[in-house]
């Protein structure tokens, strides 16, 4: 057999041996961009969608996941597991999930202030708190004009003046599942905590069961 014919025969045999393995390999479904599960309901928001961003499942096992808050400087995500009375943390670099705080007073919404401190709405204690950099908890609001709040739900910091806006519906006080069942003495409202004086003022009580808050960049 000539050398060229021998090499051709060997190459063909190797291809035949490898081909079945390649054909039976368990190929994963390729990622499609943009992710088909990310849908834009209002065309005005199309420009905010990142075309190469897929939806990922970070964790399972919570009873009611709420209030995600991203810490870009620490590369971790916090969120509330309200009925389990805990705050969870996901580390971006390792994917590890652990308990950040428990008990957490049935915390719901979270945000960060201009100094990077965590601000939280607590159903169980009917208050809005701030976690200082040393871990100490500061109460920002637990009443309005001397009357206990209902169950602060969501919170956001105003981009212009640093005021802390929060909603106060009744959800966390209706039953013990998401807080502590109790009487309601205030009309469900949206409030603002002044960044300078710390005083709480009512913004409106004309929104039925106010919940999520967000300010547009402009």
Enumerate the language-model features and the residues they cover.
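Sequence-structural signature of mature extracellular/luminal beta-sheet repeat domains
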Residues: 7, 14, 23-218
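Twin-arginine (Tat) signal peptide motif
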Residues: 1-7
């Amino acid at each position: 057999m000539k050398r060229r014919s021998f090499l051709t025969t060997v190459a063909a045999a190797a291809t035949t041996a490898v081909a079945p393995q390649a054909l039976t390999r368990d190929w994963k479904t390729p990622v499609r961009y943009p992710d088909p599960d990310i849908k834009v309901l209002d065309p005005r928001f199309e420009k905010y969608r990142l075309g190469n961003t897929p939806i990922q499942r970070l964790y399972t096992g919570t009873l009611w996941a709420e209030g995600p808050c991203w810490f870009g400087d620490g590369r971790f995500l916090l969120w509330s597991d309200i009925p389990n009375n805990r705050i969870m943390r996901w580390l971006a670099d390792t994917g590890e999930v652990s308990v950040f705080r428990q008990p957490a007073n049935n915390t719901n919404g979270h945000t960060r202030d201009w100094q990077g401190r965590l601000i939280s709405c607590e159903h169980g204690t009917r208050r809005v708190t701030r976690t200082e950099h040393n871990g100490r908890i500061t109460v920002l609001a637990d009443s309005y004009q001397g009357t206990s709040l209902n169950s602060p739900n969501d919170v956001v910091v105003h981009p212009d003046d640093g005021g802390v806006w929060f909603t106060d519906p009744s959800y966390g006080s209706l039953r013990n599942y998401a807080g502590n069942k109790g009487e309601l003495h205030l009309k469900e409202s949206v409030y603002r905590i002044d960044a300078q004086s710390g005083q709480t003022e009512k913004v409106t009580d004309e929104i039925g069961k106010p919940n999520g808050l967000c300010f547009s960049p402009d």
